[in-house]
A protein has these predicted regions:
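Bacterial Sec-dependent N-terminal signal peptides
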Residues: 1-23
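Phosphate/dinucleotide-binding and metal-coordinating scaffold of catalytic cores
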Residues: 22-211
Length: 211
């Protein structure tokens, strides 16, 4: 019995050491670094977990040296290297991908009142408030979505603009994501006119739309 207990202790110790060794602590990167800190839950005095919905409030800093130099986590206190430093609402997105360790997120940039949308340009993309953090969890190469969106855009079709970034959530390094424009009607995204109630026939309505 003692040998079994000793063997179990040894296994747990080795498992803990391997797991600890596999944890990555990000200090710098040639990619922009997004740091997300959810608000503190007064009931637990700990950061709020990010749910499927609704969005929870958080603060986000996006570290990006405009000259293209390497980005450092210590730059988080230097306004000159912060592409964004403000409030956000964030939630999980996706379906089966939510079950993976590396989860996808959707977020809205907010004004300081924690309610009003804040249209901002992130990493040179047109100003908006709805964004996606694509975890690339089902694509080990981490290039499929980036390549398909970029090729479609270069061919003259609309496709979401994308930027590779590093993501840290509540001091936990999550890995490489692509910051992506959320697909929506907008002059800089899907540039479609809003349909009015009286728009029921061609040419206002096309493409097999039924009422």
């Amino acid at each position: 019995m003692d040998k079994k207990i000793t063997g179990l202790k040894l296994f747990l110790l080795l498992f803990w050491q391997v797991s600890f060794a596999q944890q990555t602590i990000l200090t710098d990167s040639n990619l922009p670094i997004m740091v997300i800190s959810t608000d503190i839950d007064p009931a637990t005095n700990s950061p709020i977990d990010i749910p499927d919905e609704p969005k929870v409030l958080a603060t986000m800093q996006l570290i990006f040296r405009p000259d293209g130099a390497r980005n450092y986590l210590t730059d988080i206190t230097n306004d000159s290297f912060l592409n964004y430093n403000g409030r956000m609402g964030i939630e999980l997105r996706g379906s089966s991908s939510q079950e993976l360790d590396k989860k996808p997120y959707g977020f809205t940039t907010l004004l300081e009142d924690n309610d009003s949308n804040n249209n901002v340009s992130l990493l040179g993309m047109p100003s908006e408030n709805d964004w996606v953090l694509n975890s690339l969890a089902y694509d080990p190469s981490m290039i499929r979505d980036y390549l398909s969106y970029t090729l479609a855009s270069n061919m003259g079709n609309y496709a979401p603009r994308v930027k590779y970034i590093e993501v840290i959530v509540n001091d936990d390094y999550k890995g490489v994501y692509i910051l992506t424009e959320k697909i929506k009607r907008d002059s800089d995204r899907v540039n479609l006119k809003k349909i009015d109630d009286e728009d029921t026939d061609f040419p206002e309505v096309t493409g097999g739309v039924h009422h």
